[in-house]
């Protein structure tokens, strides 16, 4: 099994900053935006985007945490650890996750989101898009496009969970 670091901490920070600038450019009314991090690492990426938006625009956007597990079609989990302290009805919600792969986690997160309210618009920001979609889902904001084979794995590490920031590709062959 071979592991190769493809994004270091500096490159990750730049990708998050780029996503933040794109959010600013594409959203005319930032005061109507709610950030929704998809557990686990998407929550920490959402917090970083929230911090950058505060630094750049002086805005304190609300942030929520979506747990997609109870809404997945490939596992049964009863406990829902979603934390959404703001009413999302009529809001522009930006889902934030670490890796976009098949699209199934995003579908589950959207199901969770619409169970909480009716947002005006939902968009998606991901740190890494690796391709191989099984559902017709695409990201609106992408930090890095990293094409992979179906046997390779992308691992995103964030300092808040893993002690360091990096993205690695693992080749099991």
From Swiss-Prot:
Keywords: Glycosyltransferase, RNA-binding, Transcription, Transcription regulation, Transcription termination, Transferase. InterPro entries: PRibTrfase_dom, PRTase-like, PyrR, PyrR_bifunctional. The keyword Transcription applies. It catalyses: UMP + diphosphate = 5-phospho-alpha-D-ribose 1-diphosphate + uracil. Gene3D superfamilies: 3.40.50.2020. A motif (PRPP-binding) lies at residues 93-105. It holds the Pfam family Pribosyltran. GO terms for biological process: DNA-templated transcription termination. It comes from the Bacteria. GO terms for molecular function: RNA binding; uracil phosphoribosyltransferase activity. It is an enzyme of class 2 (transferase). Homodimer and homohexamer; in equilibrium. Belongs to the purine/pyrimidine phosphoribosyltransferase family. PyrR subfamily. This is Bifunctional protein PyrR.
């Amino acid at each position: 099994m071979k592991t190769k670091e493809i994004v270091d901490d500096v490159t990750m920070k730049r990708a998050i900053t780029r996503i933040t600038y794109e959010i600013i450019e594409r959203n005319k009314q930032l005061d109507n935006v709610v950030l929704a991090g998809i557990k686990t690492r998407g929550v920490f990426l959402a917090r970083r985007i929230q911090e950058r938006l505060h630094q750049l625009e002086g805005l304190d956007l609300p942030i929520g945490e979506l747990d997609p597990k109870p809404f997945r079609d490939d596992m049964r989990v009863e406990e829902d650890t979603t934390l959404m302290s703001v009413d999302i009805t009529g809001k522009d919600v930006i889902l934030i996750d670490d890796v976009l792969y098949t699209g199934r986690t995003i579908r589950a997160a959207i199901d969770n989101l619409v169970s909480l309210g009716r947002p005006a618009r939902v968009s998606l920001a991901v740190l890494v898009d690796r391709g191989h979609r099984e559902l017709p889902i695409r990201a609106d904001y992408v930090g890095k496009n990293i094409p992979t084979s179906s046997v390779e794995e992308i691992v995103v590490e964030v300092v808040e969970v893993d002690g360091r920031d990096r993205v690695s590709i693992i080749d099991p062959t």
